[in-house]
Amino acid sequence: MAPQPRRLIAPDAREDDAELSLRPLALADFTGQASARANLKVFIEAAKARREALDHVLFWGPPGLGKTTLAQIVARELGVNFRSTSGPVIAKAGDLAAQLTGLEDRDVLFIDEIHRLNPAVEEILYPAMEDFQLDLIIGEGPGARSVKIDLAKFTLIGATTRAGLLTTPLRDRFGIPIRLEYYTVEELECIVRRGARVLSIPIADEGANEIARRARGTPRIAGRLLRRVRDFAAVDGDPEITRAVADRALRLLDVDHIGLDQMDRRFLQTIALSFGGGPVGVETIAAALSEPRDAIEDIIEPYLIQQGFLQRTPRGRMLTSHAFRHLGLAEPPREKTQFQLFSEGGEE
């Protein structure tokens, strides 16, 4: 199968140099996630006052909300070294040992996609997190022996979009679990205006608002949309990004007024037109769209659920009346499922 082109509003797409330049460098410059920022500030100041390593931190939530950025900020605020890797890269115990033995006291090791760690590697990580020791088996067969290696007292920061896939023993070893939430339009406006200042882009408040409304609650997408709108404005000779300029550019980019793109609409239309609005299983949807199940569950569905377009029920995915209205389609009559009857009769 030919590789699919990158969606402009894909929150998990790899960041380029321009996106990296928009990242805030300090907690005070970080917009949004007020509760997470306030708590982190307390934990960081307490650790610095005690001259101890910060307790292990787990950031979890949808992609593009700032998990990596916050991890870097934590290391910078602590005044320590920052080392970064990801779960799939640490294939064997030796890979993990190489990362851990290179750390100094209070350094930060960041593991992105920590839910994808090899189970054998995860077992070795437990004593490293709890006792700051590595338990390695050297050799094979009768001559094999166990070796303990003392480690510096470090801070592990894990990031995941799927906290439910973490094993309980690993999840319980993080003393500071922090869930990141989607951003409000007002917060994204601030992020867009800051990005415009960094990139020297003239932008009106209404233009920033228009981009923020279509950024799906995600700073990474907001920055990407800002740069693409800038391109249209430059080619069209517009001196400033106004609401009209942003609207025209985003319409040409096929991003509608609430941030849905062609893939989102295709997903909704498939359920509406091919499966009568549901319920329909995610595997069936994946086959119909020729998309992997993980992409549907991690990338497409979360925002649609948050916007009230989609329900996950025991029998499968179902579109809401809101989704049919957005698509401009008549909602077909459907028999009430047992799930819906119970939802109407009590708490959801």
Swiss-Prot record:
GO terms for biological process: DNA recombination; DNA repair. Keywords: ATP-binding, Cytoplasm, DNA damage, DNA recombination, DNA repair, DNA-binding, Hydrolase, Nucleotide-binding. Residues 1-183 are annotated as: Large ATPase domain (RuvB-L). DNA binds at R293, R312, R317. Its main location: cytoplasm. GO terms for molecular function: ATP binding; ATP hydrolysis activity; four-way junction DNA binding; four-way junction helicase activity. Gene3D superfamilies: 1.10.8.60, P-loop containing nucleotide triphosphate hydrolases, Winged helix-like DNA-binding domain superfamily/Winged helix DNA-binding domain. CDD domains: AAA (cd00009). SUPFAM superfamilies: P-loop containing nucleoside triphosphate hydrolases, Winged helix' DNA-binding domain. Residues 257-348 are annotated as: Head domain (RuvB-H). It is found in: Cytoplasm. The keyword Disulfide bond does not apply. Has 3 domains, the large (RuvB-L) and small ATPase (RuvB-S) domains and the C-terminal head (RuvB-H) domain. The head domain binds DNA, while the ATPase domains jointly bind ATP, ADP or are empty depending on the state of the subunit in the translocation cycle. During a single DNA translocation step the structure of each domain remains the same, but their relative positions change. HAMAP family: DNA_HJ_migration_RuvB (MF_00016). Homohexamer. Forms an RuvA(8)-RuvB(12)-Holliday junction (HJ) complex. HJ DNA is sandwiched between 2 RuvA tetramers; dsDNA enters through RuvA and exits via RuvB. An RuvB hexamer assembles on each DNA strand where it exits the tetramer. Each RuvB hexamer is contacted by two RuvA subunits (via domain III) on 2 adjacent RuvB subunits; this complex drives branch migration. In the full resolvosome a probable DNA-RuvA(4)-RuvB(12)-RuvC(2) complex forms which resolves the HJ. Belongs to the RuvB family. The RuvA-RuvB-RuvC complex processes Holliday junction (HJ) DNA during genetic recombination and DNA repair, while the RuvA-RuvB complex plays an important role in the rescue of blocked DNA replication forks via replication fork reversal (RFR). RuvA specifically binds to HJ cruciform DNA, conferring on it an open structure. The RuvB hexamer acts as an ATP-dependent pump, pulling dsDNA into and through the RuvAB complex. RuvB forms 2 homohexamers on either side of HJ DNA bound by 1 or 2 RuvA tetramers; 4 subunits per hexamer contact DNA at a time. This is Holliday junction branch migration complex subunit RuvB. It comes from Methylocella silvestris (strain DSM 15510 / CIP 108128 / LMG 27833 / NCIMB 13906 / BL2).
